[in-house]
Swiss-Prot record:
UniProt keyword annotation of Nucleus present: no
Gene source species: Arabidopsis thaliana (Mouse-ear cress)
BP terms from Gene Ontology: protein processing
Entry keywords, A to Z: Hydrolase, Peroxisome, Protease, Serine protease
Protein name: Glyoxysomal processing protease, glyoxysomal
Length: 709
């Protein structure tokens, strides 16, 4: 289904939630990325979704709640974080939801902005008063988020927090009415920062009541299941109260990157590969067929890098948490809810075969740990357990600060100082060890018959290398040995499993140069390591740039004719630490590149959407060797130095020859190296020949236009 149709339909449900109340000390806006503040009143905003009362609430509970509210109502679901600062003290300081009715402080009020088409006499969006009915915890989503946060508790620098990176937790500075300006530091109140509190706070929802007569009754379907890579559409209002006309119901599209728990049809939490901004928390997230997937919440933010991971609470988890309020079981996918007249027609999705191919290719991506200290990703090349990964995982000292390929190369990218080595620190919990699962089958390892290829860079010290495979719907840990590490410009290495449990799923490669602008999926274990219990994540983008080399590698398997071949891929898909060694896939699920690195700004900020991969055309000898793993000379040819490849991967391509240009009437100096004149005599001759030029200025031609700096 066309995304524009999904957007048009979903605008019936997306709303902007505004909460205003007295704040004489300027404390309500803390932990919020933006606000308005006038005459002692603070205003916050978030996004929300409009829902029908008769579907969401049971008759008995609805009568009680709506009787207390005083009128018949429709419902709005939003995040609790937008209303919690304005709750009475007892509800604001409690870590759990009180049984007593929730109340706002005196003078606080809630309004929602809805699309104009929901009221026939108004064409423009308009504000509707709302009342706070209830707060709801989502236990399964909270537990999932807590487990992700606690997985990094052993590493102080790589820990996680909840909230937007625009929020300054250190001094409390917040952007005010103008997005470009920040208010003065605010006094901070002590809050618990344990994982349980953060997870509960992030996943808590608020149910609002709005007059039903103002809103009409649109119709909606609810998605019963979603898979990684599925397209999603989010409608939210970033910085909504700062300019509702400009920001109301903005559209952001992306895909599902991962979900928790892995391998389960009932999702507790989803990780979204989508660009979002503050104020979009509470936004409804729809599938490509128009079914509601869930609600966007505040992101998970990495403390040391500021990287934001967008999170979605699935609709199924919300309905489970609200089971005491539900009138009936949520409608299954493909079945319309029994309210309203407009139903979005659902047609078969032609992209399903491609999605199946991508899901199959994801089984070829594994997780690699070295000495329980770092982890990265790897790619299964054949059924005998040959794994392709990056050399910097095994020999990081070769790719450290000060030059990736030697002292002469310093990779600067838009002022960048160095590549970000995408191997990531493992959680520093020495007492915990990774389990090794006994294999169901023992295949004789072909690696035993391989003559290990050694060179100066291959270290023979003890290293505990383990690979986590995802096969037969289970995870299996296997020890592995180093087979090959490239000693030249290519950041590649090969590992061999000591034993092969069951049947593996090798990757399928595409050796052609991918067209610019075509879809690129990056699959790997970025950010979330072995203790997080997540399968590989998938982030989508496009092929932004293909850097070609004019000379082929000097190999026996590749033609030695002078011709262009792809030497580097750049994509807009997000690449995070731990994702190196992952696969870049095209829309058919075929591998087109090996992820090596992303970019880092000179100030230290990582740029995940500027990343670099080795094209499969360069990796052709690796795939040739993987066929029978006998001809090790194929690997030796990769160690031949290539000045052109080195310059490309150092981000220092050879410069074009300089054209000799001279100023008008400027005599050409003698440049013959055999000229025996001293510097003084040459300078004297220069002054004599140019004496007239210094008497009066030469009028420049009109063709020469001065350039403004």
């Amino acid at each position: 289904m066309d995304v524009s149709k999904v957007v048009s339909f979903s605008r019936n449900f997306a709303v902007l939630v505004k909460v205003e109340g007295p704040d004489p000390k300027g404390l309500k806006m803390r932990k919020h990325a933006f606000h308005q503040y006038h005459s002692g009143n603070a205003t916050l905003s978030a996004s929300g979704i409009l829902l029908p009362r008769d579907i969401f609430l049971s008759g008995e509970v609805a009568a009680k709640v709506l009787f207390e509210a005083g009128q018949d109502m429709a419902l709005v679901l939003t995040v609790a974080s937008v209303v919690e600062p304005f709750l009475t003290l007892g509800h604001r300081t409690s870590s759990s939801i009180s049984q007593d009715p929730v109340k706002l402080i005196p003078g606080a009020m809630i309004e929602i902005m809805v699309e104009g088409q929901l009221k026939s006499e108004k064409e423009a969006p308009f504000w509707v008063p709302a009342q706070l009915l209830s707060l709801v915890d989502v236990p399964v989503s909270s537990a999932a988020l807590q487990s992700l946060i606690e997985a990094s508790s052993g590493s102080k620098d790589s820990g996680w927090d909840i909230g937007w990176s625009l929020v300054s937790a250190a001094n409390g500075s917040q952007p005010s009415i103008n997005i470009e300006h920040y208010s003065k530091p605010l006094m901070q109140l002590d809050e618990p920062h344990n994982a349980n509190f953060m997870a509960k706070s992030a996943t808590r929802m608020a149910i609002l009541g709005v007059p039903l007569s103002l809103l009409g009754q649109p119709s909606m379907n609810f998605a019963s299941s979603s898979s990684k890579g599925d397209t999603l559409v989010a409608l939210g209002s970033p910085f909504g109260i700062l300019s509702p006309v400009n920001f109301f119901n903005s559209v952001s599209t992306g895909s599902i990157a991962n979900s928790y728990p892995s391998g389960s049809l009932k999702k507790s939490l989803m990780i979204a590969d989508v660009r979002c901004l503050p104020g979009m928390e509470g936004a409804p997230v729809f599938a490509k067929n128009g079914h509601l997937i869930g609600i966007l919440i505040r992101p998970l933010r990495q403390k040391n890098s500021g990287v934001e991971i967008q999170l979605v609470v699935p609709w199924g988890a919300i309905t489970t948490a609200c089971s005491h309020l539900l009138l009936e079981e949520p409608s299954v996918e493909g079945k319309a809810s029994q309210w309203g007249s407009e139903v979005l027609s659902v047609k078969s999705d032609a992209s399903i075969p491609a999605q199946v191919a991508i899901e199959k290719a994801m089984e070829s991506v594994c997780l690699i740990t070295v000495n329980d200290g770092v982890w990265a990703s790897g790619i299964i090349l054949n059924e005998h357990g040959l794994i392709l990964t990056n050399a910097h995982l095994l020999e990081p000292w070769r790719y450290g600060k000060g030059g990736v390929y030697g002292e002469g190369f310093k990779p600067y990218v838009l002022g960048a100082e160095e590549f970000s080595s995408t191997g990531s620190k493992f959680w520093e919990q020495k007492s915990q060890t990774l389990p090794r699962k006994a294999p169901r089958n023992h295949y004789s390892s072909v690696g035993e018959n391989i003559r290990e290829y050694k060179h100066n860079f291959l270290q023979t010290g003890h290293r505990d290398i383990r690979v986590r495979l995802c096969h037969l719907d289970s995870w299996t840990w296997c020890p592995a040995n180093v087979v090959y590490i490239c000693k030249e410009q290519l950041d590649i290495a090969l590992l061999q499993l000591e034993y092969v449990p069951g049947k593996l799923q090798p990757i399928t490669a595409n050796f052609s140069s991918p067209p610019l602008g075509t879809t690129a999926h990056v699959v790997g274990h970025g950010l979330f390591g072995p203790r997080c219990g997540l399968s590989p994540s998938i982030c989508s983008g496009v092929v932004a740039k293909v850097v070609h080399a004019k000379r082929r590698l000097n190999t026996q398997s590749i033609s030695q004719e002078v011709a262009e071949f792809p030497a580097m891929l750049e994509t807009t898909a997000a690449v995070h630490p731990g994702g190196s060694g992952g696969a870049v896939l095209n829309s058919s699920g075929h591998m087109i590149g090996l992820v090596t690195s992303n970019a880092r700004h000179g100030a230290g900020t990582v740029i995940p959407h500027l990343n670099f991969s080795i094209p499969c055309a360069v990796l052709a000898p690796i795939f040739k060797f993987a066929e029978d793993m006998q001809n090790t000379t194929i690997l030796q040819t990769l160690d031949q130095p290539s000045e052109e490849l080195s310059s490309i991967w150092a981000l220092m391509p050879s410069l074009s020859p300089k054209t000799e240009q001279s100023l008008p009437n400027l005599p050409k100096l003698l440049k013959d190296g055999n000229n025996k004149q001293t510097k003084g005599s040459q300078f004297a001759k220069f002054i004599a020949e140019t004496q007239d030029m210094f008497v009066k200025p030469t009028k420049l031609s009109r063709d020469v236009i001065p350039s403004k700096l």
